[in-house]
Amino acid sequence: MDFVVDYQTYAMADTAAPELPEPEPRLNLTSDAQSQPTGILDLQFKLPDLQRYSNNNATLPVDNDGAGSKDLHKKMTHYAMSSIDKIQLSNPSKQLGQNSQDEKLSQQESQNFTNYEPKNLDLSKLVSPSSGSNKNTTNLVLSNKLSKILNNYTLINYQATVQLRKSLKVLEENKERLSLDEQKLMNPEYVGTLARRALRTDLESQLLKEHITVLEEFKPIIRRIKRLSSSVEKIQRTSEKLLSNETNEVPTNNVVLQEIDQYRLKAEQLKLKKKILLSIRDRFTLNQVEDDVITNGTIDNIFFEVVKKVINIKDESSFLLTLPNLNAGNALIMGVNEILEKTNKKIFNYLIDFLYSFESSSNLLNDHGTTEQESLNIFRKSLVFLSSDLELFNELLKRVTTLRSKSILDEFLSQFDMNSTTSKPIILSAHDPIRYIGDVLASVHSIIANEADFVKSLFDFQDEDLKDTPISILQQNKTFLKGIDNKLLNDIIQSLSNSCRIRIEQIVRFEENPIINFEIVRLLKLYRVMFERKGIQDDSSIINNLKSLEDISKNRIIGYYEDYMKQTVMAETKNSSDDLLPPEWLSEYMNKLVELFEIYEKTHAAEDEESEDNKLLSSKNLQTIVEQPIKDVLLKQLQTSFPLAKKNEKEKASLLTIEINCFDLIKSRLQPFEGLFAQDDDSRKITIWVCDKLKEYTKQMLTLQIKFLFENTGLDLYSNLVNMIFPVDSVKDELDYDMYLALRDNSLMELDMVRKNVHDKLNYYLPQALTDVQGNLLFKLTSPMIADEICDECFKKLSLFYNIFRKLLIHLYPNKKDQVFEILNFSTDEFDMLIGIDH
């Protein structure tokens, strides 16, 4: 920096200055008189005394002694020429042509100044125009001089030159920051001098400050040296004393050595103690960086590493409580608890902020530049660490439940907004209630599916998320954390249970059609299963509401048939059925039952896993809609329609006919659904009871028709008499007829009496017996199979008795066989042919 200040030496200073100050030795700008021999001085050119010429306006001699002249311009010319000559001398390796040209130029300039004539000078031209030219020449010369100095690597002080170059380079690089005015600094006038001095002052002040700072840093070192100097000197003296001892034997009673040994042992103990304390400090305390991470750091993996260290400190500090003095352990545990409380609150706030911004965040990167997957991993890890504080963790779950419950409830209710422009609203239609319920349940299922995806994306913990978790947290909360997503989902969905139930219940409670109600039951059951597959627990409120709605629909189905029996059937009881066909209400009722059974069988597999009480067509409900209407309504109505059936056999025949028709209708309609009634013993008893009743009435009808046949043929009296002694059906051979020998003494068995009672009736009725039975009475049975069965059985009984009775008379009156043939004049074949029996 010396050159920066000494640059003023070459400026155009005032001519009143006595002498031009010499530059610093570094520039090596010694005068011609100092550096060159006298022979060279004779070659210097001389400038005219322009001032004297201008003042005296006369011809004056020119002073050729440029070096000794006090004129500023002459001195500048002298130094310029000296510099040029020195440059020429220092570069002898230049080409000869170049040197000759420089010498010619020097000689020409010298001759010009030597041959200078005052008469040719014009003061105004010499002073004014030439002053700028002289300055430019001077600056050019100085610039060349400076370049030569900076590029001269042959100088002795090479390091100083390098440092100078670096200093100038530093100034050039920091020109803008230091607000350096290059033009002002390079100005050769007084303004430049002031600027350079100011720059030097500033640089020296800054350098002085830095030196002072360095010296201040040495103060503690010096103080420590002064403090330890006495001990070091003592050790040095002792060591010199020991080394001066020529013998290797050291006396055992040397107090100094014993003292040194004690100090050495004490020093080792102190080192060990220090090492232990440092280890304890590193293990049970946080450094400044870790404390800053806890206080000011963001929630990331580094933060969790620090929290993990704090938890480990808490877990490992329990041994301090076993010490006699519990202060250290209590203080450490209290400090750790405060840090954990602070971290848990910070994690809690982070989780709340994350939840609020998760839905609205459309960018895959958050404010800290982490990806969405990394953010989710940090979120789960935050939940794991927060689970150690149950109060804050439960508060977080409540916040999440409240936030998401409100969100999904608003979304669900918006589906019913008639003024909504975003989506088509769900409209209740009286013509299609099933579609309305399906839309409601589909909307709920969509919300549950979306919410399940949302919850599982945040709260579904995998083993990978728990691998870096402290053991103390895993032992307490691992099982709980793995099921937190389902628990949270069920808590959130509870907000939809009442709103969903209200909108479905208004349809279920007022729907009367059992088929529609059954479709509603199927729909509710289907979505209940779908909800459970999405993670909704079977004991949650929304599932319980769906079950209650199912029960309401099932009760409405059963109630419909009960109401039908109470209302419709009561109107039918006032009219008796003259055609002996089943009443119309029974046919309609069975049609409705069959329609229900048909649609039920299609979905019967869906109820296999349900309990008996929850089934729609359980044994209890089947008894209600099948057995009870028959017992309590149908049979009572038939008894009411034929009040004389017990006294009048024809009335009884009509009653049996309509009963057979009714039970045959019931059996035929229920027979395709035997599998439905075979689910348990109680249900199976219903169909068995119907079949038994039909058989019972058929048997009664058969007995009654046989009685009618025997009465019409006149054989009824003899049938009773013969069967009283020995059943006709039991007669197998001729010996069995001996059982009837006692009948000879009975007057009714006399042939004349038999002729009187049987012959005319038999001959009159037998030809028309088949037509009478089939046409007049059995024609009213709706089942041809039952009618044929009764008819065939009646005539078989009649044919059997006629054949046995004829043989019995022959056996009783073997001598009157012709008379017997006259009374019972139809042979067996003829008799069978007339009544339509085929053998």
Curated annotation (Swiss-Prot):
Broad class of where this protein is predominantly found: Golgi
GO biological processes: intra-Golgi vesicle-mediated transport; protein transport
Domain of life: Eukaryota
GO cellular component, one term: Golgi membrane
Subcellular location: Golgi apparatus membrane
SMART domains: COG6 (SM01087)
Keywords: Golgi apparatus, Membrane, Protein transport, Transport
Record InterPro entries: COG6, COG6_C, COG6_N
Family label: Belongs to the COG6 family.
Protein task: Acts as a component of the peripheral membrane COG complex that is involved in intra-Golgi protein trafficking. COG is located at the cis-Golgi, and regulates tethering of retrograde intra-Golgi vesicles and possibly a number of other membrane trafficking events.
Protein name, entry field: Conserved oligomeric Golgi complex subunit 6
Lineage, top ranks: Eukaryota, Fungi, Dikarya, Ascomycota, Saccharomycotina
